[in-house]
Amino acid sequence: MLEANVYDNFNPNYYNISDFSMPNGKKEKRGLPIPKARCQVINYELWETGYLYTSSATLTVSVEVGDIVQILFPEVVPIEEALGKKKKLNLDMVYLVTDVDESNKATLKNYFWAMIESLDVPNAITKTTNFAIIDYLIDPNKNNLMSYGYFFNSSIFAGKATINRKAETSSAHDVAKRIFSKVQFQPTTTIQHAPSETDPRNLLFINFASRNWNRKRITTRVDIKQSVTMDTETIVERSAYNFAVVFVKNKATDDYTDPPKMYIAKNNGDVIDYSTYHGDGTDLPDVRTAKTLFYDRDDHGNPPELSTIKVEISPSTIVTRLIFNQNELLPLYVNDLVDIWYEGKLYSGYIADRVKTEFNDRLIFVESGDKPNVI
């Protein structure tokens, strides 16, 4: 049976204030409070990352919507927080209580996703680096919940991901989901004692580090003994259309008097000017689904870029997902890169989540989308 700590809400309005006196006289953010209750956890389904599913558990003390629940596991998780600097974290899963029924069964939202809920990201930020986007997301000045920093593997999140959008902002949930899918990594949350021995505070960190700084692919196989289930996941949801008829406003007439240009999404996901296509049609969709688009020219008189049109007619990215019981002889951790043999076929991807119940310990493997760096 698991145990849990229950806290009042980690409200940044209170904790994001730098008036805590350190032994050296420096002022820091207020640390987390002591738990208001310790309880047991039964009838639970607990997701470690919660990128897709909501958790639930029945607690042996009363909880309220807005409370924070830290589930404690008799297990340690290895991470390498910097190159050559390995440590082991006690496995804990931190949630926000979003609902409680009459039997005191709580609906639990993973802390990271609850923290950034309702936050929007300006497109100026999404056009920068992955690190800059994450730094924008993990900011208690803007977020719903308090955090004190993060363990971060810069090698995993190196580079830039271009997120094509028509609107001026994108939801933080959407941006985060797309970045994590692209780099094959999901964040977790942990409550730890402050790194300095002279710092008495307990703090909450977001973990963006895996068990090895340089992740190496692990090859394994799963079979019927691990109760495998297979389905699909749409990691990037785009358009139901595959053909665009594009009108661009004529500046002289201030109307759509110029002949339209046509664009088509090929079977491999590329979007091309249809007038330049000289193939035999076998690499094009079996059924054309057209959409008519109207655009103004920009301030310099330029028509829309191809990337703008691509958003309108690119197909969704759908990948295979395998859910199976943990193999105690070869334990896998969330964010491991894995090549899995199943029923004679090799799937390449990563462990995106882990779910613990009273009866089993199961992993979610998500296949790599293997798409260009436009998400």
Swiss-Prot record:
Signal peptide region: none
Main location: virion
GO cellular component: virus tail, baseplate
One BP term from GO: symbiont genome ejection through host cell envelope, long flexible tail mechanism
Cystines in this chain: none
Localization annotation: Virion
Keyword Ligase: no
Keywords recorded for this protein, A-Z: Viral baseplate protein, Viral genome ejection through host cell envelope, Viral long flexible tail ejection system, Viral penetration into host cytoplasm, Viral tail protein, Virion, Virus entry into host cell
InterPro entries given in the database record: Caud_bapl16_1st, Caud_bapl16_2nd, Caud_bapl16_3rd, Caud_bapl16_4th, Gp16_dom1_2, Gp16_domD4
Role, per record: Forms a dome thereby closing the central channel at the end of the baseplate. Changes its conformation upon activation by calcium allowing the channel to open at the bottom of the baseplate for DNA ejection.
Summary of subunit composition and partner proteins: Homotrimer.
Similarity section: Belongs to the skunalikevirus baseplate protein gp16 family.
Name listed for the protein in its UniProt record: Baseplate protein gp16
Originating organism: Lactococcus phage p2 (Lactococcus lactis bacteriophage p2)
High-level lineage: Viruses, Duplodnaviria, Heunggongvirae, Uroviricota, Caudoviricetes
